[in-house]
C-alpha cells in the first residue's frame, strides 16, 4: 500500500526545500526589485508608467500601426495610460497558437469624488468613494498619500503625488476615540465604519479674513500655488488615497513581503 500511495498521492513540499542556494539568492534579488516596483506603483497609471520604463530598458519599442514587425521584435501598446500590452513577435502565424500571460495592476483604494472638497466644523475634507472590496475599518487612522492626475482648463495634465516623500504631508480618515465609541463597538465590522464615513481630512488652518469656508479656501489656495488647480478642475481629476506605508520584509528571516 505504501508503494502505491507514494506513486499516486501528492505530497506538498515547502518551496524552499525544492531550490538550491543559488536559486535562493536569485529569489531574494528578484523580490527586492519587486518591492521597489510596489513602492513606486501605487495606482494603475504609475504601474503602467513604470512597466513601460522597464520594457524600454529591455528592448521594447512603442507599437505604431503599419510599423514593420519581424520575428523577435519587442513592442508595447499603452491604452490610455492605465493598461499595457507587451508582445514579442514570433516566427509563425497566430493560427498556430500564442502564449498569453495576463495580470491586473489595479488595487483596492479610496477615490476622490468629482466635487470632493467641503468644510465642516472648521475642518476641510475630501469626499470619497471606495474602489474594490475594501475592509473599511482598515482605512481609518492610518497615514494616506494622494496620487493621480488633474486636467486643467487649458488641457494641461498635471501629475499629483503628495505624501510619498518623508518631508511631505499626509492625510487621514478619522475615527472615534475609544471612550466615545460605546455604540460603534457594538456594531458589526461592516457597519462600524461606513462608506459615507470615509472622508479624508486635508486641512484645518483658515484663510486670513472673515467669511465662510475659510479653511477650504486656504487648502484650495495651497493647491493652486502647487499645481494651478481650481475647484472646478476636480471635475476632470482622477485622484486616489492609498496607504502611506513603504513595502517591507516580514519576519526574522525576512521571508515575506508586506505592503500595499
Name these PLM-found stretches.
Residues 1-260:
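N-terminal hydrophobic/helix-forming segments and targeting peptides
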